[in-house]
Curated annotation (Swiss-Prot):
The active site is at 208 (proton acceptor). Keywords: Glyoxylate bypass, Glyoxysome, Lyase, Magnesium, Metal-binding, Peroxisome, Tricarboxylic acid cycle. Pathway: Carbohydrate metabolism; glyoxylate cycle; (S)-malate from isocitrate: step 1/2. InterPro entries: ICL/PEPM (IPR039556), Isocitrate_lyase (IPR006254), Isocitrate_lyase_ph_CS (IPR018523), Pyrv/PenolPyrv_kinase-like_dom (IPR015813), Pyrv_kinase-like_dom_sf (IPR040442). PROSITE patterns: ISOCITRATE_LYASE. The gene is ICL1. Gene3D superfamilies: 1.10.10.850, Phosphoenolpyruvate-binding domains. Catalyzes the formation of succinate and glyoxylate from isocitrate, a key step of the glyoxylate cycle, which operates as an anaplerotic route for replenishing the tricarboxylic acid cycle. Required for growth on ethanol or acetate, but dispensable when fermentable carbon sources are available. Also acts on 2-methylisocitrate. One of its GO terms (cellular component) is glyoxysome. This is Isocitrate lyase.
Length: 542
């Protein structure tokens, strides 16, 4: 550190040392595919006069990067699922190399307001960071407990578990503007997250990725979020893994038309008969006149049909056919205007006028919904366009989808890697999908690796912790009500013993021996109140 009362020369020397250190850090292979729009100086001067400590989460981020790199190199997959609590984390660590923390699960089971609800990201913004801290502290505790045994030589090599499994957490849509994104990222780093994902939905209208009514923000607005996440990590000296998620595949709304990259996908009224007659004006008047919900739905449906709401390239195709033009004119237009061309509405109108000799009627303001949002028609190619824009600012790209569709996943992967070869990708193996209907049992077994072959190196079941917990408790409760202690003794305890589950000795699992050791150390080697002394019932399991 440097004293703020130090000489100007000393402060300048400290600042330069920070700049040099940051530039050296950014020159590491870890950052070869990461784009930053700011200099090391801009970060150094915002770190304060005390050099940042190395957060434990930074070590975990480095570990996660190495894990993902090995999977990418070997053509394998890091697969995991959403953990609810320390019990699940300690058992998962035996078999999986990453842990996921789901916003959905937190929304229903762990909100810091203690008010459960669906996944609308309307819980306090520290909810998911709190859960990360809960799990990470448990990981650290179980690691300390085990390390003591390793040092004492009282544990077999085959028993050793790597409890420090990197955690990737759900950052939702950032919980507000860029300052909120910065603070949220900071919280995640301080509380133990090795990585986070952040999505391109609006924070005010955020929905679960498998709900209707999803509204995305302009491309550049989400890029700004990603830049802010990385900036926060840089200020803290963190190697945070950043996953860019797009919900545009099934998005039906857009918050703003500010970014021309979105223009291809925005729906507009194509019938001049509705010119000067916005849908919202009609709805507002109907409300004042006492219209019911059913009335409003009918008015909206009839207006949309009359307005003939379409994408601009569809309007052009209709106009070309009406003017007697052949398919070559439409093909000429589509060769310059397509999902990945990033053509603005002004360029589309100019090209249409050049090819048809007239400007086409197209108004995307007229059909705006009650919240003032624009109508949007996403899709896989829309997701490709967005992922390509996000890729330079994130370590992995992820398209949220409505079905476990291999061909769609392939289209997305090929679209992204065509521009960014070798780009790492993530896939949500969502329990919202009906897997039994989606594919055969054999296909279920190979699905993860088939996606892995496409570049999806990190895959996760968001809510498996929730569902397995619910299933286990439902079944045990039913059997316990009917069979009494036989249900516990035979279905739980005996299976724990038969399978060598460490939790059967729950006192030892909870660290009672470790804490006894601390007590003895503090009291010169003796502790009459040791929890694991003579009389502990766990001796029955020897």
């Amino acid at each position: 550190m440097v004293s703020v009362k130090a000489s100007a020369a000393e402060k300048k020397e400290f600042l330069q040392s920070q700049i040099d250190e940051i530039e050296k850090w950014w020159s590491e292979p870890r950052w070869k595919d990461t784009k930053r729009i700011y200099s090391a100086y801009e970060i150094a001067k915002r770190r304060g006069s005390v050099k940042p400590n190395t957060f434990p989460s930074t070590v975990m981020s480095q570990k996660l990067f190495k894990i993902l790199g090995e999977h990418a190199k070997n053509g394998t997959v890091s697969k995991t699922f959403g953990a609810l609590d320390p019990v699940q984390v300690t058992q998962m660590s035996k078999y999986l190399d990453t842990i996921y923390v789901s916003g959905w699960q937190c929304s229903s089971t762990a909100s810091t307001s203690n008010e459960p609800g669906p996944d609308l990201a309307d819980y306090p913004m520290d909810t998911v960071p709190n859960k990360v801290e809960h799990l990470f502290k448990a990981q650290q505790f179980h690691d300390r407990k085990q390390w003591e045994r390793i040092c004492d030589g009282t544990i077999e090599e085959s028993e050793i578990i790597d409890y420090l499994t990197p955690i990737v957490a759900d950052g939702d849509a950032g919980h507000g503007g860029l300052t909120a994104v910065f603070k949220l990222t900071k919280m995640f780093i301080e509380r133990g997250a090795a990585g986070i994902h952040i999505e391109d939905q609006t924070s005010t209208n955020k929905k679960c990725g498998h709900m209707a009514g999803r509204c995305v923000i302009p491309v550049q607005e989400h890029i700004n979020r990603l830049i802010t996440c990385r900036m926060a990590a840089d200020v803290l000296g963190s190697d945070l893994i950043l996953v860019a998620r797009t919900d545009s595949e099934a998005a039906t709304l857009l918050s703003s038309t500010a970014d021309s990259r979105d223009h291809y996908f925005i729906l507009g009224a194509s019938n001049p008969a509705v010119k000067g007659k916005p849908l919202n004006d009609l709805l507002n008047k109907a409300i004042l006149d006492g219209a019911t919900i059913d009335d409003l739905q009918t008015i909206e449906k009839e207006w949309l049909a009359k307005a003939d709401v379409k994408l601009f390239h569809e309007v052009f195709a209709d106009a070309a056919k009406a003017a007697g033009k052949d398919q070559s004119v439409i093909d000429q237009f589509n060769s310059k205007v397509n999902p990945l061309s990033e053509t603005s509405i002004y360029e589309m109108q100019a090209l249409a006028k050049e090819l048809l000799g007239t400007e086409l009627f197209f108004d995307w303001d007229l059909p705006r919904g009650r919240e003032g949002l624009y109508r949007y028609q996403g899709g896989t190619q829309c997701s490709v366009m967005r992922a390509r824009a996000f890729a330079p600012y994130a370590d992995l790209c992820w398209m949220e989808s409505n079905y476990p569709d291999y061909e769609q996943a392939k289209e997305f992967a090929e679209g992204v890697t065509a521009k960014f070869p070798g780009k790492w990708m993530a896939y949500n193996l969502s329990p919202s999908f009906n897997w039994t209907k989606a594919m055969s049992v054999d296909e279920q077994e190979t699905f993860i690796q088939r996606l892995g072959d496409l570049g999806y190196i990190w895959q996760f079941i968001t809510l498996a912790g929730l569902h397995t917990s619910g299933l286990a408790i439902e079944q045990f409760s039913k059997n316990f009500a009917k069979l009494g202690m036989k249900a516990y003794a035979q279905d739980i305890q005996k299976k724990e013993l038969d399978n060598g589950i460490d939790m059967v000795k729950h006192q030892k699992w909870s660290g009672a021996e470790y804490i006894d050791g601390l007590l003895r150390l503090a009291q010169g080697g003796l502790a009459a109140t040791a929890a694991m002394g003579q009389g502990v019932t766990e001796d029955q399991f020897k």
